[in-house]
Amino acid sequence: MSHEGEEDLLEYSDNEQEIQIDASKAAEAGETGAATSATEGDNNNNTAAGDKKGSYVGIHSTGFKDFLLKPELSRAIIDCGFEHPSEVQQHTIPQSIHGTDVLCQAKSGLGKTAVFVLSTLQQLDPVPGEVAVVVICNARELAYQIRNEYLRFSKYMPDVKTAVFYGGTPISKDAELLKNKDTAPHIVVATPGRLKALVREKYIDLSHVKNFVIDECDKVLEELDMRRDVQEIFRATPRDKQVMMFSATLSQEIRPICRRFLQNPLEIFVDDEAKLTLHGLQQYYIKLEEREKNRKLAQLLDDLEFNQVIIFVKSTTRANELTKLLNASNFPAITVHGHMKQEERIARYKAFKDFEKRICVSTDVFGRGIDIERINLAINYDLTNEADQYLHRVGRAGRFGTKGLAISFVSSKEDEEVLAKIQERFDVKIAEFPEEGIDPSTYLNN
């Protein structure tokens, strides 16, 4: 249970239970489980963490039924066709459902979202007009997606209300929803800026919060302004509550900052940061001149087999221009970036998720946490500047342990340096894309 989120808080690094999960086992789990955010993976009772400090887990589960969840949750899980928890879920849920603080770092696609969704719903005893669960994330689309996960798993819990709040929309609408006891949510998913504004204006009462979750916590807490927003929100909640933090990447520098919000946390890390690359994802690069990118992209879209593709560029201007070019070249595409109006962003995100378009051009607004199951091709039209961001980008393809393909354009000396850093950081060999192409069976699921 956690207390304050102040800068000068003690770090509880001497007390946490730390579980190091073998990355290869986690990947195998992801491959054998159902293709969804709640169920990657088969169980492995012989955890690699057995000899590590505080690595005991009270319950070893072979299926979701062994978590002894509420019947309503179990029904929803069965409806989704889920049977076996992923390695991360297996090690985390038995303690998180009992209120243990959690700091979890595991690669994209291993079902971290389901950990806090199921854990908080399991503990929730809804009281009309009282917010019991707060989930904070850095992106509006991610907030929308998390809200949908709550709706999916609470389908047999009709008394549970969930709402999502983010900037770019009239705060008066949020205030109206919160004021009415018939519509006031028990679960709030929000971006930090909007939730801070609701707290400051006293539109929302967080004095009954029992669970406080930060998704993509490294991104939320590494930016000072966002961290201050989170601290202000944190101080508006009770001292006695559960705090859970999740991310695909957690640097050594950000972990002490996370721990300031936690007390006696269970810590879940993959055993080796170098193994964070995605199992089942084929990764290649293509060396070319900047002026050759458009022609090569068109060739790839013609030659490759894919369900949906996401193309990453470095600016909103380039996103708009490339989308125009693709549409003019008979490649129906949609673009999503941070400079468009919020309603438009959400509408386009939904359109892409609903398979109305197969091609999406985006900036890094789609680079973290967004789960669209049909994406099996990611193209870095402009290579990112950071190795960790590369992981988040290409993680949009090959989600949940399924196969996928990632191709990066390398057009400058800077790109070559970044590519070298990526390979060193993740201990992976990214090969040059063969001139003759590749066998679709290597990146397409049966």
From Swiss-Prot:
Result of altering residue 173 to G: In SUB2-201; no growth at 37 degrees Celsius
Gene3D superfamilies reported for this sequence: P-loop containing nucleotide triphosphate hydrolases (3.40.50.300)
Sequence motif DECD box, location on chain: 215-218
Modification type N-acetylserine: residues: 2
Annotated consequence of substituting residue 308 to R: In SUB2-5; no growth at 16 degrees Celsius
Record field: catalytic activity: ATP + H2O = ADP + phosphate + H(+)
Entry's EC annotation: 3.6.4.13
Leading EC class: hydrolase
Biased composition (Low complexity): 23-41
Pfam families, per the entry: DEAD, Helicase_C
Keywords: Acetylation, ATP-binding, Helicase, Hydrolase, mRNA processing, mRNA splicing, mRNA transport, Nucleotide-binding, Nucleus, Phosphoprotein, RNA-binding, Spliceosome, Transport
One of the GO BP terms on file: mRNA 3'-end processing
Binding residues annotated for ATP, in chain numbering: 106-113
Domain topic, free-text comment: The Q motif is unique to and characteristic of the DEAD box family of RNA helicases and controls ATP binding and hydrolysis.
Family statement: Belongs to the DEAD box helicase family. DECD subfamily.
Protein name per the record: ATP-dependent RNA helicase SUB2
Species assigned in the record: Saccharomyces cerevisiae (strain ATCC 204508 / S288c)
Lineage: Eukaryota, Fungi, Dikarya, Ascomycota, Saccharomycotina
Gene symbol of the encoding locus: SUB2
